Amino acid sequence: MESRIWCLVVCVNLCIVCLGAAVSSSSTRGTSATHSHHSSHTTSAAHSRSGSVSQRVTSSQTVSHGVNETIYNTTLKYGDVVGVNTTKYPYRVCSMAQGTDLIRFERNIVCTSMKPINEDLDEGIMVVYKRNIVAHTFKVRVYQKVLTFRRSYAYIHTTYLLGSNTEYVAPPMWEIHHINSHSQCYSSYSRVIAGTVFVAYHRDSYENKTMQLMPDDYSNTHSTRYVTVKDQWHSRGSTWLYRETCNLNCMVTITTARSKYPYHFFATSTGDVVDISPFYNGTNRNASYFGENADKFFIFPNYTIVSDFGRPNSALETHRLVAFLERADSVISWDIQDEKNVTCQLTFWEASERTIRSEAEDSYHFSSAKMTATFLSKKQEVNMSDSALDCVRDEAINKLQQIFNTSYNQTYEKYGNVSVFETTGGLVVFWQGIKQKSLVELERLANRSSLNLTHNRTKRSTDGNNATHLSNMESVHNLVYAQLQFTYDTLRGYINRALAQIAEAWCVDQRRTLEVFKELSKINPSAILSAIYNKPIAARFMGDVLGLASCVTINQTSVKVLRDMNVKESPGRCYSRPVVIFNFANSSYVQYGQLGEDNEILLGNHRTEECQLPSLKIFIAGNSAYEYVDYLFKRMIDLSSISTVDSMIALDIDPLENTDFRVLELYSQKELRSSNVFDLEEIMREFNSYKQRVKYVEDKVVDPLPPYLKGLDDLMSGLGAAGKAVGVAIGAVGGAVASVVEGVATFLKNPFGAFTIILVAIAVVIITYLIYTRQRRLCTQPLQNLFPYLVSADGTTVTSGSTKDTSLQAPPSYEESVYNSGRKGPGPPSSDASTAAPPYTNEQAYQMLLALARLDAEQRAQQNGTDSLDGRTGTQDKGQKPNLLDRLRHRKNGYRHLKDSDEEENV
């Protein structure tokens, strides 16, 4: 009982002492504590917004309780503790666990240098040849006769061209020889059809004579044409008849022909294709192809041909071997040459003075930085004596020697003989290895000192069993694969070197890190092993090995960190790490400990040290840190504001340098265009040049042709010879009628013709009016119109036998006029009808008419007669009316014609 009382007294005293110390501490550091408390809550609240859920829960609990409230089951108040952070590692106790798994650190780590792929690299000079895709070009001569038949129909003023037919025929061989020796052609052509000989003459002359060749006006750069006639001839036939004429033109065309390897045929610019090798000479049929009719093929050695077909008496040239091929429309001739002398399968492409050859398992890689390309080839060399290399062998060796003399003669020596390789793309590489003179001297010195050396490098020979012949594969047109290979090889070498450095640095870093971990584990094995395994682990040394166990987890929300690190019982002593209180899971008993690294709780609070003033200590807890100044909590610090120790090992990796790829053009556009035997451009130019020769005289051609004439001609032609003759007759008659109608219509359409028709119409109207008025006067005054001489100039009637002037007498009465009209003599008229004269008989009437006719003839003769003395007309002598000229001349003076003396006597 006494012991219990004693214990209670001791506890009460301890509480009084603690409360007194707390009051004195709060009174001496009231301002600082208050500021620290406010800063702590502010920082904790700010950090809780970006922290984990557990932190927010702890902060809320701290805020919900009062500052002076006592923590459950402790003598501490909530103002004496701060919140916690469990972001990375949870709070745990690792010192209580017993190790069950044993581990140790490796000590004998050996880092070996990573070696790249074993490659045999050689330096040298490279000359590259490509396949020659340009077709073999040579000259050919084409002999032709052009027969042009034209049919026309002639109208009166127009000629209709009914049609034209052009036929190309081949001259006979005897005429070909005459053309080649004299530049002349005959003006006729004969053909046998079904046993009948048909002959055509130029201009229908029916005379066979020679015509001189002359240059055509239409030629181009690749073809030259010689003709005998430049203008097409046609003659107009008779009117309303058909006419068909013949125009014969001899034509010799010297044009270009192309043949592509393997030279089985060739094609000309005129569009002709000959299935014969241009190198076939009659004896090399196994090497040269022949696919034409052998009966029409001729070869003449030492054949003479004029040098210029367009010049008379031109000099003759002798050709070694000339071939002739007869066809239905032409004769083609060319000179036979030796294939080896005029063709070559290879042509120079590029040269690289700095080339690296790397040896792979089954191939060689020829890399050129200048060409930004890598070419692959088999290890088997091409036989230097291959016949395909004859045309380029000397040229390639000379180029290699020239490059060596220019760039390497002073510092390098040739290493080995010239070797030839064929790449996968069909290219041919001439390779000359080189090596520095200093290295060559060292090799020679080593060979002299080591007599037992059996693995000396020997020169490669092309005469060995590994030599092959050049294949007939075609060269590729695109070298993208070579540039891709160069890129891959460059990247491969760079990446391999980088990986080797990375692997070596990685091994060294692992070895160093392991040694550091081993030494640090002696201080805090749990922290080191937790960092290695990235999870909380309890570890302790068990001799020279480590024992591993899992840590004991605690209630995360019960952990509280004390603000004060001073030891109350021992003035001048301070805790080396902050004191924490916590509860184990499923327990309400409050435990004391100290905050370790990575939120590890160290059991007990015996870790103290002498207080050092001033003092600054920072303890990491998750993503934040507790800052204690003079062993009192001041604030929470974000870890990102504290710099870290840079312990990274530098890795020596250089960035890739820029590489500008060259645009490699294996074959130019000209070579690609020349590789085809058919050049469309030249063919069209040749066609247009010949088309311009076919021209017509437009003033002699009327288009369109009347459809009825064309239909009638077709109809009658289908009836045979008789129908054709009838058609010609009908066409002549119908053509005449049509010509007249067409002429009238054309005349009416002409402005001059229309004006003439208008004038004719006006003249017809005037004539009609004059005839009408004359007939009307004739009806009203028949005597005055029929016998104009009975009327005097003053309008009175003239009567013969009367001497008395009646102009002054009064006119007779009506009765007298009627009576006197029937009287024959003077005397008073009779008023009785019985006294009238007897009727005239027919004979008397007839005699009267005859007398009237004689009188009329005499009077008209007198009017039309002329006086031989003075030249005046008879009408003027007899006192007729003045003529029109006299009246116009004297119209203002009142001119009147006076009577002659004869007239006065008669009166």
Curated annotation (Swiss-Prot):
Residues 1-24 form the signal peptide. The chain crosses the membrane at residues 752-772. Residues 773-907 are intravirion. Residues 25-751 are virion surface. Gene3D superfamilies: 1.20.5.1890, 2.30.29.100, 2.30.30.1230, 6.10.250.3280. Residues 878-887 have a biased composition (Basic and acidic residues). Its main location: virion. Glycans are attached at residues 68, 73, 85, 208, 281, 286, 302, 341, 383, 405, 409, 417, 447, 452, 456, 466, 555, 586. Residues 41-62 have a biased composition (Low complexity). Residues 152-158, 237-244 are annotated as: Involved in fusion and/or binding to host membrane. A proteolytic cleavage by host furin generates two subunits that remain linked by disulfide bonds. GO terms for biological process: symbiont entry into host cell; virion attachment to host cell. It holds the Pfam family Glycoprot_B_PH2. InterPro entries: Glycoprot_B_antigenic_N, Glycoprot_B_PH1, Glycoprot_B_PH2, Glycoprot_B_PH2_sf, Glycoprotein_B_ecto_C, Herpes_Glycoprot_B. Residues 697-749 are annotated as: Hydrophobic membrane proximal region. Disulfide bonds join 94-551, 111-507, 185-250, 344-391, 574-611. The keyword Cell cycle does not apply. A motif (Internalization motif) lies at residues 895-898. The record marks 460-461 as: Cleavage. Residues 29-62, 798-838, 857-907 are annotated as: Disordered. Envelope glycoprotein that forms spikes at the surface of virion envelope. Essential for the initial attachment to heparan sulfate moieties of the host cell surface proteoglycans. Involved in fusion of viral and cellular membranes leading to virus entry into the host cell. Following initial binding to its host receptors, membrane fusion is mediated by the fusion machinery composed at least of gB and the heterodimer gH/gL. May be involved in the fusion between the virion envelope and the outer nuclear membrane during virion egress. This is Envelope glycoprotein B. The gene is gB.
